């Protein structure tokens, strides 16, 4: 589940679709997300994804909360960065494959190391996505 918009904003549709796909086709399900689904839905949604989602890929973007706010401009303001980290950490309890991503060339090598440290600390994998025009 990915595309234009945050998939967890239509959580009921996401869960129903994932359940149907799992039951009918037994295909792996991946969600690409900004990691703010629990803020969007005003509750911890991660346990609801257990058994429905095989991989969740969270856009980390940067290891720095201030830079994250500048880039993402979330309507949830300053609590967004910590909420995204907490969401991802919670995912490691319920979802088999948890990945956080940044895009190559958009941050420094030092920042990439800091992103790796965040992922190591919370139990997620770190992936640097290629920059594509």
Regions found by a protein language model. Name each.
Residues 1:
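Hydrophobic anchor at the beta1->P-loop junction of P-loop NTPases
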Residues 4-133:
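Conserved AdoMet/S-adenosylmethionine-binding subsite of the radical SAM
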């Amino acid at each position: 589940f990915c595309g234009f918009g945050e998939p967890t904003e239509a959580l009921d549709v996401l869960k129903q679709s994932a359940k149907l796909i799992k039951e009918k086709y037994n295909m792996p399900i991946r969600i690409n997300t900004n990691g703010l689904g629990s803020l969007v839905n005003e509750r911890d949604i991660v346990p609801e994804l257990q058994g429905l989602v095989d991989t969740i890929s969270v856009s980390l973007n940067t290891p720095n909360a201030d830079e994250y706010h500048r880039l993402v401009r979330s309507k949830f303001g300053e609590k967004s960065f910590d909420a995204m980290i907490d969401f991802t950490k919670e995912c490691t309890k319920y979802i088999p494959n948890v990945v956080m991503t940044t895009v190559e060339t958009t941050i420094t090598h030092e920042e990439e190391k800091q992103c790796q440290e965040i992922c190591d600390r919370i139990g997620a994998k770190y992936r640097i996505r290629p920059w594509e025009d």
